[in-house]
């Protein structure tokens, strides 16, 4: 078995090779929803945008499942390879793939069975509900394929092939983008056309991802690798829980936000549907930035995991700090775009009246005001997951959404009305940033001390041997 370049290649080169394809692959996941939103907004109107927004929690739950198994199994694989345990790595990967399939089928069945109930819980109004039901009933068909594809992409990156992972996602996005205008406008299928275009794109990505099973280089599968092991499954889920819990929290906050916006919006001149549609556009625009941060995080994960397992702590620190610098560049560009060009961005998603644009611009500028720092929490959570400290990673993943954003979204509107929903975002972002800096700072200091101790051991070994001889 050849030596893994994760252990010796220069960190900037590794991060470029791993993060850039991961960013592209992660962006594709957001583009699936963005492309639908743009074409549906142009073809159906703002009620169509509101409908895709109401159905969006199905996608975030799907991603949570994919991250639970995908990040969990990939983290296990990276640690096992770093410790030179190839059989354990194969077992982790095999069990992860089986879990992806099982969870995907269960999710489809549960979603279709309770579709109407879930859409109402997600905040669908009377006017939006029929559009949302038509869209969600179709897109749920593609969820099992999406779970396997997203989960496999993490394993493919852990195997040292981030470009192939990127190709899998890009092919599906291209097909989706081509089919969207054909199905929506040419075939006149409306919102259903956008849904079918998404599903077909996901199936093509799934086929490409599954083909990689016979191409793994650092992992050598045997039949036993795919036998579901409860202990191994629990280890996988425990290591993926931090990334997954963050997505689950995103889903919860989406539901709370949608219901808060419709409730407090009804008390204002904006009504119920305008805040719902505007929220969807702002969130999905921000999802592009978050996708880049997630891509950087996923690209950094195998580098950090492998070198932590190999006790090369100086490389762990270097990888994390470089990822933070990349994030700062992206966040600065995003801040400028959101604060100075909000109406231009919102106009991409279709037309609306003056009230619609007034609220959407206000929403974007206020809610995304602290975009400069909100990526640090995601990178830090992934950092702890990569080094095997899944509990701390899960705790950090939950800070922004669960500990800060949910209570603020419930409490601030009591004093500030619908404006309180918007203000909750930047306050939660800044609070999570402070906590992330403190926790990661403590961990990096521990690793620095461990590096010093290891260097002393290496120095003393030759001296002791000379003394014996």
Model-derived features: where do they sit?
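Residue-level signal for short hydrophobic patches within transmembrane helices
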Residues: 12-31, 58-65, 141, 167, ...
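Transmembrane helical elements of multi-pass membrane transporters/channels
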Residues: 17-36, 138, 149, 172, ...
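Helix-terminus/linker motif at the lipid-water interface of multi-pass membrane proteins
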Residues: 31-50, 119-126, 182-189, 251-282, ...
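Hydrophobic/aromatic residues in alpha-helical transmembrane segments
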Residues: 36, 73, 114-115, 152, ...
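Short runs within selected transmembrane alpha-helices of multi-pass transporters and secretion channels
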Residues: 70, 139-157, 165-173, 194-207, ...
């Amino acid at each position: 078995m050849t030596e893994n370049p994760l252990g010796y290649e220069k960190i900037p080169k590794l991060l470029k090779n791993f993060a850039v394809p991961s960013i592209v692959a992660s962006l594709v996941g957001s583009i699936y929803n963005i492309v639908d939103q743009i074409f549906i907004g142009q073809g159906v109107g703002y009620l169509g945008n509101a409908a895709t927004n109401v159905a969006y929690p199905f996608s975030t739950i799907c991603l949570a499942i994919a991250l639970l198994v995908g990040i969990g199994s990939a983290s296990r694989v990276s640690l096992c390879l770093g410790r030179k345990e190839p059989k354990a790595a194969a077992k982790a990967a095999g069990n992860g793939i089986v879990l992806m399939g099982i969870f995907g089928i269960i999710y489809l069945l549960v979603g279709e069975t309770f579709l109407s109930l879930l859409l109402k819980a997600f905040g669908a109004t009377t006017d939006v509900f029929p559009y949302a039901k038509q869209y969600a009933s179709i897109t749920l068909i593609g969820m099992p394929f999406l779970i396997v594809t997203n989960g496999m992409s993490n394993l493919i990156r852990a195997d040292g092939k981030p470009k192939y992972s990127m190709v899998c996602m890009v092919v599906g996005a291209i097909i989706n983008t081509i089919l969207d205008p054909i199905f929506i406008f040419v075939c006149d299928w409306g919102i259903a056309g956008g849904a079918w275009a998404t599903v077909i794109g996901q199936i093509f990505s799934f086929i490409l991802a599954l083909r990689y099973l016979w191409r793994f280089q650092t992992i050598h599968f045997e039949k036993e690798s795919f036998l579901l092991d409860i202990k191994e499954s629990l280890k996988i889920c425990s290591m993926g829980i931090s990334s997954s819990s963050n997505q689950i929290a995103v889903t919860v906050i989406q539901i709370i936000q949608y219901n808060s916006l419709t409730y407090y919006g009804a008390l204002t001149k904006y009504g119920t549907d305008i805040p719902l549609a505007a929220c969807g556009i702002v969130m999905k625009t921000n999802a592009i930035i978050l996708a880049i941060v997630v891509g950087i995080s996923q690209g950094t994960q195998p580098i950090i995991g492998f070198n932590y397992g190999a006790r090369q702590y100086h490389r762990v620190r270097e990888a994390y700090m470089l990822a933070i610098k990349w994030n700062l560049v992206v966040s600065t560009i995003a801040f400028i775009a959101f604060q100075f060009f909000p109406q231009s961005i919102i106009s991409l998603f279709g037309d609306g009246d003056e009230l619609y644009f007034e609220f959407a611009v206000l929403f974007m500028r206020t809610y995304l005001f602290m975009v400069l720092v909100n990526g640090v929490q995601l990178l830090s959570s992934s950092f702890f997951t990569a080094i095997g400290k899944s509990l701390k990673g899960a705790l950090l993943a939950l800070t922004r959404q669960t500990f800060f954003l949910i209570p603020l979204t419930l409490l601030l509107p009591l004093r500030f009305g619908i404006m309180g929903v918007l203000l909750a975002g930047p306050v939660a972002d800044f609070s999570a940033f402070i906590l992330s800096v403190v926790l990661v700072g403590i961990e990096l200091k521990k690793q620095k001390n461990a590096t010093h101790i290891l260097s002393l051991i290496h120095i003393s070994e030759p001296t002791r041997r000379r003394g014996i001889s």
